[in-house]
Amino acid sequence: MTNELLKDLEWRGLIYQQTDAEGLENILNKEQVTLYCGVDPTADSMHIGHLLPLLTLRRFQNHGHKPIVLIGGGTGMIGDPSGKTDERVLQTEEQVEQNVRGIGNQMDKIFDFSGKEAAQLVNNRDWLGKISLIDFLRDYGKHVGVNYMLGKDSVQSRLENGISYTEFTYMILQAIDFGHLNREYNCKVQIGGSDQWGNITSGIELMRRMYGQTEAYGITIPLVTKADGKKFGKSEAGTVWLDAEKTSPYELYQFWINTTDADVIKFLKYFTFLDKEEIERLEQSKEEAPHLREAQKALAENVVRFIHGEGALNDAIRISEALFSGDLKALSSDELREGFKDVPQAEVSNATTNIVDFIVEAGISSSKRQAREDVSNGAIYINGEREQDLKYEISEADKIDNEFTIVRRGKKKYFMVKYK
């Protein structure tokens, strides 16, 4: 019998590799399965690069299965070599603990921690921290061959540049995690990114050797790529975080709304819970009326609503619409700061009041002659209001919070002018 969940994951392109497709399908059809996905606390917030495996785990929860979210308070002290060309810098214990708390607090946004399919949050420091070196070598190291470990991509790719024994053993620690969750919670499936294949299969092999456990499975999801070859998960401002203090809901909305036509349908399949019928409708809209950007709006709205809630989404849309229309009066001073923090910044003297002198000093127009032309031609807007009077004086009323003024030149060129 075809499993509907696996069928949906295949359609979305979310299954990159799996250890035993037939065995996994059988257990998903006959029982409620417990699965897990791990996140190492490399920062005090997750970023959008963490989303895909976690959203895939959430899809299993939506279909009646039980997710375990593992935060690597133990493995985070070591550092995963997978996907890295250089040795990681070790974090302090205090930093790891702070990061564990920060990431743990974000899991409420992604998983449901109530009901029959309630998610569980665990920290592998709780069991890895209790294993002595002698126990590690006798109880676990004895079951893992060095040749087997050397054959894994995560290790092989590092041999030329060097890999420390610390990072070399990471694979065994993750294998211990899978075994622990299997014994304590009857967890049978691990989900991870494509770079986790070696770590996942090592866990399955360790369980087979130590406990004779053959009912354990692994799924990896694809690396998220963009059609233009650029790295996914970065904006011009840098990493796109899930913490609203690091990346505001407005910035998150802008990140997704700017998705290209070449990527948007794939990202709708990856990052939203919209069904096949709706995504196919959006794909048709993209082909027939690309200027409406309906697919991009659906992507941005669904992700921001899921991560930050309806209120934050509405604020993000309101800021976006106000900036697009130039109606800045609709925005608060904080929203203006938020919306314009990435535009060119300039400083002018508080004593400069004439509009021509003002826009020259701010570098908005290259000369007084150019400035006079810009003003006379209606190309200059002060806080969203067109100003064509060459004698206009910048007043206190133009200084938002007595701190800055938003100036627009032409249709789209914005500047934030501050006072000194």
Curated annotation (Swiss-Prot):
Instruction: Identify one Gene Ontology CC term for this UniProt entry.
Output: cytosol
Q: Which family does it belong to?
A: Belongs to the class-I aminoacyl-tRNA synthetase family. TyrS type 1 subfamily.
Enzyme Commission number(s) from the entry: 6.1.1.1
Q: Where is this motif: 'HIGH' region?
A: 41-50
Q: Where is this motif: 'KMSKS' region?
A: 231-235
Q: Where does L-tyrosine bind?
A: 36, 170, 174
Q: Which CDD domains match?
A: S4, Tyr_Trp_RS_core
Q: Which GO terms describe its molecular function?
A: ATP binding; RNA binding; tyrosine-tRNA ligase activity
The identity of this protein, by name, is Tyrosine--tRNA ligase
| Organism (species) | Staphylococcus carnosus (strain TM300)
Catalytic reaction list? tRNA(Tyr) + L-tyrosine + ATP = L-tyrosyl-tRNA(Tyr) + AMP + diphosphate + H(+)
Localization, UniProt: Cytoplasm
Can you cite a GO biological process for this protein?
Answer: tyrosyl-tRNA aminoacylation
Q: How does it assemble?
A: Homodimer.
The family database entries (InterPro entries) matched by this protein are listed as: aa-tRNA-synth_I_CS (IPR001412), aa-tRNA-synth_Ic (IPR002305), Rossmann-like_a/b/a_fold (IPR014729), S4_RNA-bd (IPR002942), S4_RNA-bd_sf (IPR036986), SYY-like_C (IPR054608), Tyr-tRNA-ligase (IPR002307), Tyr-tRNA-ligase_bac-type (IPR024088)
Residue sites binding ATP per the record:
234
Q: Per the database record, which ranges form the S4 RNA-binding domain?
A: 353-420
Spell out the PANTHER family in the cross-references: TYROSINE--TRNA LIGASE, MITOCHONDRIAL (PTHR11766:SF0), TYROSYL-TRNA SYNTHETASE (PTHR11766)
Q: Which Pfam families match?
A: SYY_C-terminal, tRNA-synt_1b
What is the top-level taxon of the source organism? Answer: Bacteria
Q: Which NCBIfam families match?
A: tyrS
Q: What is the lineage of its organism?
A: Bacteria, Bacillati, Bacillota, Bacilli, Bacillales
